[in-house]
């Protein structure tokens, strides 16, 4: 950064001051090197504002035409990477305005009539975030599609379901994956709901009180595709609820990714061995030649903490601000930008990684055969024979304890042995010769044949419904 560039910073407002800003303060307060990513949205908002000014007779049509010509050139320079961003011009808005004025003269100076950078930046952020939300919703759809494909391939694959990381009941792997489809579906719904509050136009609020020019805010809103305008000028320039709400929705997206990541890491570990992840998503060790590390899901877990931190940062940023705009709000952009980048990159890579997962059904089945996964089925069997559930629960617990001492599974006990160890006494005859049909893994999952259940038929129906909803 040259000394001459630094010396010029503040030209848009420096006439009020008796001494120049220090170089350190210039660097401390500038935002151009991160808010320049709003540039194309800044141009979009400015063109709509210029169209409104001309329509209302506030500027001449000739000025509007010059503004459009200049903005077209600036847009081309930015897209080609040839635009010169200057720290001395502080932010994205003044950089573009200065270049516009250099290109079209006084017409460029008239563009800022009836607006402030306060409502300008609020508009830019909303335009940018709206676009990013649309992208995130599409990426959530792609990830759900990948999960549905894998679930469809494994509608009959049985693995143990866990509570407290202890074997609980057998479920199908397809059913397990559908749980994440549900989570990411809710995430998409939250993003769409958040978008409604993002999609309001603050432009026209000016610095904080509105403007004395005869502007038409509804026209600008229509031009930019907003659903309506912010109804209070003070709130319009100071509101960052929409950014906080988005970050909360994004934190939930990452939380769901993190839960899935934890399972992927667990499933891939040699001690479990339920799946393998394609090599292109893993790394090795610089010292241990045998290692294949699931770095992508591990990093996703870690990045979730960063996104959660951005949410807390924005809440803290806003908690002590009086109305209306304060410079604190400049600090909203970097956490918001990083949240979007992290979520977008994560969803893209996971949508690509899921199809590369190799499932190991034999290992899943072997694990499901341990830990008495069908114990609840035996209790249900006794209830259907007329035994109260609590008595059935106790009887099966006795049987499990006997299996522990004999180092066997419930299905390994004969009918006579089950009757003996159940503690049911004269009611032990309720355990009939058909008891082993409920102690199979296939029988257990097939019995859960209702909406939301793990039966393969229900899993396939749920997959079809989820695909139709994409």
Curated annotation (Swiss-Prot):
Annotated metabolic or biological route of this protein: Amino-acid biosynthesis; L-arginine biosynthesis; L-arginine from L-ornithine and carbamoyl phosphate: step 3/3
Cell compartments where the protein resides: Cytoplasm
UniProt KW keywords: Amino-acid biosynthesis, Arginine biosynthesis, Cytoplasm, Lyase
Pfam families: ASL_C2, Lyase_1
PROSITE patterns recorded: FUMARATE_LYASES
The protein's enzyme class: lyase
InterPro entries: Arg_succ_lyase_C (IPR029419), Argininosuccinate_lyase (IPR009049), Fumarase/histidase_N (IPR024083), Fumarate_lyase_CS (IPR020557), Fumarate_lyase_fam (IPR000362), Fumarate_lyase_N (IPR022761), L-Aspartase-like (IPR008948)
Catalysed reaction equations from the record: 2-(N(omega)-L-arginino)succinate = fumarate + L-arginine
GO cellular component: cytosol
GO BP: any one term: L-arginine biosynthetic process
The family this protein is said to belong to: Belongs to the lyase 1 family. Argininosuccinate lyase subfamily.
Name used for this protein in its record: Argininosuccinate lyase
Species classification: Bacteria, Pseudomonadati, Pseudomonadota, Betaproteobacteria, Burkholderiales
